[in-house]
Amino acid sequence: MLFCDDSKKYLKEQNINLKNEFDKDDKRVEKFSLKHQNIYFDYSKNLINNYILKSLLESAEKSSLKDKIKQMFNGAKINSTEHRAVLHTALRDLSSTPLIVDGQDIRQEVTKEKQRVKELVEKVVSGRWRGFSGKKITDIVNIGIGGSDLGPKMVVRALQPYHCTDLKVHFVSNVDADSLLQALHVVDPETTLFIIASKSFSTEETLLNSISAREWLLDHYYEDEKAVANHFVAISSKLDKVKEFGIDLEHCYKMWDWVGGRYSLWSSIGMSIAFAIGYDNFEKLLAGAYSVDKYFKETEFSKNIPVIMALLASYYSCTYNSQSQALLPYDERLCYFVDYLQQADMESNGKSVNIAGGTVNYQTGVVLWGGVGTNGQHAFHQLLHQGNIFIPVDFIAIATSHHNYDNHQQALLANCFAQSQALMFGQSYDMVYNELLKSGLNETQAKKLAAHKVIPGNRPSTTILLDELSPYSLGALIALYEHKIFVQGVLWDINSYDQWGVELGKKLGKNILKAMNDDSSDEYQNLDDSTRQLIAKVKNK
């Protein structure tokens, strides 16, 4: 049974008024909130009642979700278009039960690879790994893009208070040389270790940045190729290309086909995280995610946070035609969390074809966007409060901070809670009109201005409150959203683990690059007039 069938449309006819729902049920928050360890999930400000939630849960029970959860964790090839298992969960699994994929126990492989990463991190941190000139490494530059950049960068920033190794970690992703130059301007070639993170070792942006970084290094070492081995490690499955680059294969770390890029921070791709926060803290990150994996796998749907998250998001998409989801973390340390989750969500569920290959006739993935509070309040919250677009909101708040500025933390949390309350209750015309009269305006002035100050309210939001932002709790938070994305894909009958939509642009980009360098080429002759004219404008600059 598909989640987005016509039977969902009638749920909107319940005409939920949040203020009324809270007024008539003093146990609403208790009914519509959940807890996993130190994460509190309050979904009471959503447009639901007991009847709607029951209907959504029944749809989940009738779907293939239970079977799909088992299949994913057991290594079935649920990525059907690429014939691959989806096992990022195995990277953080603390159990010892064998998990066989294509005839191999991948638990042993994962354990072995973790140990290799741990040894590298400890070797660099301790100073036993030295640069070519004999100096200790002081800076790590991670060169990767997409999942090889967004996840590690987000975690390294989020866990800045846990940095404990004296290593400075930098990230380079964009093919725009400015991305690389920003890093090279602040590092010393004699004390820098580069991580090249590319499964294929042919990703255009990563390869071009890596080649330029290599040239920069060799320029300092008078073209002595032996220097490369002291200053580069790789995370790739293409050993021949890694060796050709000059990297010792002993320092090439694995990427498996059963780990998608946007779910890879738990793998060797998370090496840059371990360099910043130490390997012990990296393991705590994995442990937090594992706690959610167990909880997700073992908890009934009605008490399962990722399932409820997915049901609400799918309900709004199918019933209210929501095309957007706002994510508002009220913590500066989570400043890259929206960017990270954009890829995880939109690359996973931005699909218009079902698993069988048929075109879907319902809305699937939405635009996920947002920003850090309180900055967003002075930028885009106006649209959330008074715009005419339906946008569900997720607030993420941290109860305690790492600093001693308690007045700042209280103000931050007060603003977060106030925004969710304002979205829910709004302010009516009568409320505004009476306030304006009290402020000294006459009736004519008050009537003229009141309509502009009305805030409709009744706009749904969820608040996720963490006790603290630690490696463990961050791992758990990420895993909650990962599983939410998975559940939505199952409900919509789409494959959340391929990304064919990004391939065409890559292919055309290579053709256009050839055309830019040779206007007699077939690639140039096959261009449309608009693209040809754009190339001409660039050449005539």
From Swiss-Prot:
The keyword Lyase does not apply. The active site is at E347 (proton donor), H378, K506. One of its GO terms (biological process) is glycolytic process. It is an enzyme of class 5 (isomerase). Its EC number is 5.3.1.9. InterPro entries: G6P_Isomerase, G6P_Isomerase_C, Phosphoglucose_isomerase_CS, SIS_dom_sf, SIS_PGI_1, SIS_PGI_2. It catalyses: alpha-D-glucose 6-phosphate = beta-D-fructose 6-phosphate. Pathway: Carbohydrate biosynthesis; gluconeogenesis; Carbohydrate degradation; glycolysis; D-glyceraldehyde 3-phosphate and glycerone phosphate from D-glucose: step 2/4. Catalyzes the reversible isomerization of glucose-6-phosphate to fructose-6-phosphate. HAMAP family: G6P_isomerase. This is Glucose-6-phosphate isomerase.
